[in-house]
Amino acid sequence: MAKFKIQRAKGREGSTIYTYTANGHNECVATRLWDKEGGGPNDIEGGKMIMGITWFTPGGSIDYSSNPMESIYYVLEGEMTMTIEGGEPVLLKAGDSFHCVGGVSKSAVNTGEVGTKMLVCLLPPQD
């Protein structure tokens, strides 16, 4: 198995990028760049990371939920308000990021007046 892989842009020959609707995600479009179904992380030796981009309309959100994966959310455009269950909301603007361990219940909402584009990186628990 190779130690690296090139991912072609969606629509280009050989691309495995796909768009999907995720449970608990509202008024948004998620695109998975790398994962088990989309050509990674198991397509490279030792690969584990999952990565995608989500576009949120104004008011778009993610309901409170948790997963076992370490998560990093990076705001590319617009703004998002992230909240850890029981905690205070934190406004993230373009260039800001949010990093949490697995098992944390969190929510997100685009509180701005324009769309938000967010890079999402997930690392499943290690065996």
Where are the predicted features?
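A generic "binding-loop/recognition-motif" signal
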Residues: 68, 88, 104-105, 114
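Short acidic-glycine-tyrosine-enriched beta hairpin
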Residues: 86-102
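A generic structural signal for short beta-strands and their flanking turns/coil linkers
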Residues: 29, 47-52, 71, 78, ...
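A short, N-terminal "cap"/entry segment at the start of jelly-roll beta-barrel domains
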Residues: 1-48
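Short, conserved beta-strand element in jelly-roll/cupin
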Residues: 53-57, 67-82, 121
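Conserved short histidine dyad/triad with adjacent acidic residue
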Residues: 32-40, 50-67, 102-103
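Short beta-strand His + acidic residue motifs that chelate non-heme Fe in jelly-roll/DSBH
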Residues: 62-64, 82-83, 100, 106-113
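A short hydrophobic beta-strand segment most commonly corresponding to one strand
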Residues: 54, 72, 99, 113-127
